[in-house]
From Swiss-Prot:
TM annotation in the entry: 26-46, 77-97, 105-125, 158-178, 193-213, 228-247, 256-276, 294-314, 333-353, 376-396, 399-419, 525-545
Role this protein plays: May be required for the biogenesis of c-type cytochromes. Possible subunit of a heme lyase.
InterPro entries recorded: CcmF_C, Cyt_c_assembly, Cyt_c_biogenesis, Cyt_c_biogenesis_CcmF, Cyt_c_biogenesis_NrfE
Family: Belongs to the CcmF/CycK/Ccl1/NrfE/CcsA family.
Topology class, membrane: Multi-pass membrane protein
Cellular component terms per the entry's GO annotation: plasma membrane
One example GO MF annotation: heme binding
Gene Ontology annotations of biological process type: cytochrome complex assembly
Gene: nrfE
Organism ancestry: Bacteria, Pseudomonadati, Pseudomonadota, Gammaproteobacteria, Enterobacterales
Name of the molecule in the record: Probable cytochrome c-type biogenesis protein NrfE
Transmembrane helix in keyword set: yes
Effect of gene knockout: Triple nrfE-nrfF-nrfG deletion mutants no longer attach heme 1 (covalently attached to 'Cys-122', the CWSCK motif) of cytochrome c552 (AC P0ABK9).
Location of the protein in the cell: Cell inner membrane
Keyword Cell membrane: yes
Length: 552
């Protein structure tokens, strides 16, 4: 709590020593949080089951990389990771601007420090990962089997890294409101920090989609699950924010758009944590959590959101020079982009929160599924593609390479969505060793069953040979795993691909002597979806690199 006080005092009294003290405080806070996270990680690596959190989420036979993923595999560790990464962003901001005298920078640090203080208070009071038990547990309960996947080593850190960068950008916007001026210079700083945050969030969403495709066993890459939507919502607002800031930093227009989108992105980043960690929404990713945490989490979200909106309503001034729209100008196309993103955001927000509101009113339980989201967002998605084409080919100015790369990624993503949906073929059937089935011109032959014991689970692995016109082109090895510590059975799909086609096999329950249920899929274009996301990130990073060179 001392850091925001020294920051505000330094601005108010114009005392450089206070500003230096603020930077030192933020750097010290990051160092202490890094130490705390390092200690927690060490407890996992040595299987210290005297720590309740370790005993609940780890197992002595886990590999070291899965023990690392287990550090943020539960509520307490993931929140500590989020606070650590937000502190890292704050320390980087403080170090980068340590020589600046503009009040914008200490005010930004003050806003960041207030949010960090609130989050740390929640961690200490309701989410302490270091609570111990004596005598220690003999063995841990193991990591949730759904989370025992390489993608989960990087997926949560990338999401929190993205949230942190976007919260820094929002803090710059809030600091500019406290200062009483949001101009092109402020927008450039906001854009510079929003861009890497958006890139990290995009990478995290891509990894999460890949994990869902590889792990959940239904052959799809996006389920419109509340937890998935929790990361999509700030991504939508942040994407709109980057487009708005591109005009604000260059021409000083769309200031109110940029300010409001920065605040909305902050609110949605906090809402994502509320959705994921409060246990108030049913999710395929759901964890067994104490709903007592929902009240302080919601209070924290409401406090920061209302304070940010109140500050905007109090201090927002004229939105910059008037915007004159003429034909298919860049301004008109970006305004259309902002409106379309806001429409999709509203659709996803309503579909995600409606079940929660319905339940809180005592009307029962319900879920909003993929048909609603697909049908409601499809028209706006098609309009976005039209706007992208117009922005690329109709604008009279030379197309910038970063925008071209990012928009090519959007088009590749859209092509992947369409092709994978149209080409998908599937079949469910029972097979025993020696039997085969043909799907989409490919033959799947169940050859044998391999029983294995690996680390923290035992496995029944089917060997399924894959043939194309009598020529063997590979094999699939779907599994049924049994995790002893949790007494839980999981299906582990097997996927083979050649750059265009994906062959996907899932082995289900035993239905008779040497007979098992199988689900088989053949589809094309799925990898284009993730390739499109990577192109978007490449375009964003290229834009940031060019912008940095231009500023220098």
């Amino acid at each position: 709590m001392l850091t925001p006080l020294t920051a505000f005092a330094g601005v108010r009294l114009r005392w450089p020593a206070m500003m230096r003290l603020t930077c030192i405080g933020i750097l010290a806070q990051f160092a202490l949080l890094l130490l705390a996270f390092g200690v927690l990680t060490y407890c996992f690596l040595i299987s210290d089951f005297s720590v309740i959190y370790v005993a609940q989420h780890s197992y002595s036979l886990l590999s070291w990389e899965l023990k690392l993923a287990a550090v943020w595999g539960g509520h307490e560790g993931s929140l500590l990771l989020w606070v650590l990464l937000l502190s890292a962003w704050s320390a980087l901001f403080a170090w980068h601007y340590r020589q600046q005298t503009d009040p914008l920078f200490p005010l930004t640090l003050a806003v960041l420090s207030l949010m960090l203080a609130a989050l740390l208070l929640f961690v200490v009071l309701w989410s302490d990962p270091f609570v111990r038990i004596f005598p220690p547990a003999i063995e841990g309960r193991d990591l949730n089997p759904m989370l025992q996947h390489p993608g989960l080593i990087f997926h949560p850190p990338l999401l929190y890294l993205g949230y942190g960068g976007l919260m820094v950008a929002a803090s710059v916007a809030l600091a500019s409101l406290l200062r009483g001026e949001f101009d092109g210079a402020c927008a450039r700083i906001c854009w510079r920090w929003a861009l890497p945050g958006w890139s990290a969030l995009t990478a995290g969403i891509i990894l999460g989609s890949w994990w869902a495709y590889c792990e959940l066993g239904w052959g799809g890459w996006w389920f419109w699950d509340p937890v998935e939507n929790a990361s999509l919502l700030p991504w939508l607002s942040a994407t709109a924010l980057l487009h708005s800031l591109s005009l604000t930093r260059q021409r000083g227009i769309f200031c109110h758009w940029s300010l409001l989108l920065a605040i909305v992105t902050l609110m949605l980043s906090l809402l994502g944590t509320l959705i994921v960690r409060s246990g108030i929404l049913v999710s395929v990713h759901a964890f067994a959590l104490d709903n007592v945490r929902a009240v302080p989490l919601f209070s924290l979200f409401a406090l920061i959101s209302l304070a940010s909106l109140a500050l905007y309503g109090w201090r927002a001034r004229d939105g910059g020079p008037a915007v004159h729209f003429s034909g298919l100008s860049r301004e008109m196309l970006i305004l259309a982009t902002l409106l379309l993103f806001c429409a999709v955001l509203l659709i996803v927000l309503v579909g995600t929160l409606y079940p929660m509101i319905y339940g809180l009113l005592g009307w029962g339980r319900l879920s909003v599924g993929a048909p609603y989201f697909n049908r409601a967002t499809l028209p706006f998605g098609l309009l976005m593609l039209v706007v992208i084409v117009l922005a690329t080919f109709v604008s009279g100015k030379r197309v910038q390479l970063p925008a071209l790369v990012a928009h090519a990624g959007v088009l590749l993503f859209a092509a992947g969505v369409v092709v994978s949906s149209v080409s998908r073929q599937e079949i469910s059937l029972n097979l025993q060793p020696g039997q085969q089935v043909t799907l989409a011109g490919y033959t799947f032959r169940f050859e044998c069953l391999d029983l294995q014991a690996k680390g923290n689970y035992t496995s029944e692995k089917a060997i399924v040979a894959l043939f194309d016109h009598q020529q063997r082109i590979g094999e699939l090895t779907p599994e049924r795993r049994f995790y002893e510590a949790r007494r839980q059975q999981m299906m582990e799909p097997s996927i083979r691909w050649n750059g265009i086609h994906d062959w996907y096999a899932v082995m289900g329950e035993k239905t008779g002597p040497d007979r098992y249920a199988f689900r088989l899929y053949v589809q094309s274009g799925v990898r284009w979806i993730w390739g499109g996301g990577l192109l978007m990130i490449a375009g964003a990073l290229l834009s940031g690199w060019r912008g940095k060179k231009r500023d220098e």
